Curated annotation (Swiss-Prot):
Residues 52-84 have a biased composition (Low complexity). The lineage of its organism: Eukaryota, Metazoa, Ecdysozoa, Arthropoda, Hexapoda. This is DDRGK domain-containing protein 1. The chain crosses the membrane at residues 3-23. PANTHER family: DDRGK DOMAIN-CONTAINING PROTEIN 1. One of its GO terms (molecular function) is ubiquitin-like protein ligase binding. It comes from Drosophila simulans. Keywords: Endoplasmic reticulum, Membrane, Transmembrane, Transmembrane helix, Ubl conjugation pathway.
Amino acid sequence: MELIILVGIAVALLVVIVTLYLLQKKNAAPETKAAAAPQRGVPQRAQEGVPRRAQIARNQRNRLRQNVPAAPVAAAAGAPPAAGDSDHEDEGQVDGDEARVPQGAVLDEKMGAKKRAKMEAKEQKRLQREQELHDREQRKVKEAKEEAERKQQEDLEAEVERKRVDAERLAKEERERKEHEEYLKMKAAFSVEEEGFEEGDADDQDNLLADFIQYIRDNKVVVLEDLAVAFKLKTQQVIDRIQELQADGTITGVIDDRGKFIYVSEEELLAVASSLNNADASPSPSWPRAATT
């Protein structure tokens, strides 16, 4: 029951709304026709806001007169026209100018707003293109400047690196040169000392040989380089001299791979031989101490 009532109310409202809409539309129709009807006695061109051809021709003539040189104008002014022909001349000029007015001028007057908008759009595009070209040129200049600065920085770093390498090379060459000079000086000093040792008398040589042998016996284990420095000899000369003394039986011992000579006395050799023959016997304590020193 309630549903039927609601449906009836909705239908009634719909009928009222449609009726009001139709009445409003009917009242608005005469007003639209009256507004659309052209005004009597007023030219269509005037109603549309389009200027008359005479006005257009007059404007065109004024523009042409502004472009005419002053001399022809003065010559024309010197011959005044007849008074009776002035009106006909004006009308003829109006008609002639109207005939000479290009159709584009009329269209410009009719489409002034559209053309102005179009020209403004073109001008805006032109300005935009010029701005883009300007920005592009500025960007190219900036990139070229950055590239030049980067290349300059790379050249500077390369120059610094080259100077550093040259300095290291010169320092190395100087160090090697000094080492070579010191080596030559040392070599010359050894040569002089060797010559002085070899050119000494027999007594001095015998004394030096005795001191050499006694030095080995006292130290048991001697470093060959230290022995060479002590007696102002070369290391190879020390080795040769020890081998000669071993060959004639003056001293006994061994030269190890560490550049040392280990002296072994006759008593120690006998003790070693006895320990080898007797397994229960222990070797002399002085031998291992001397061997491991």
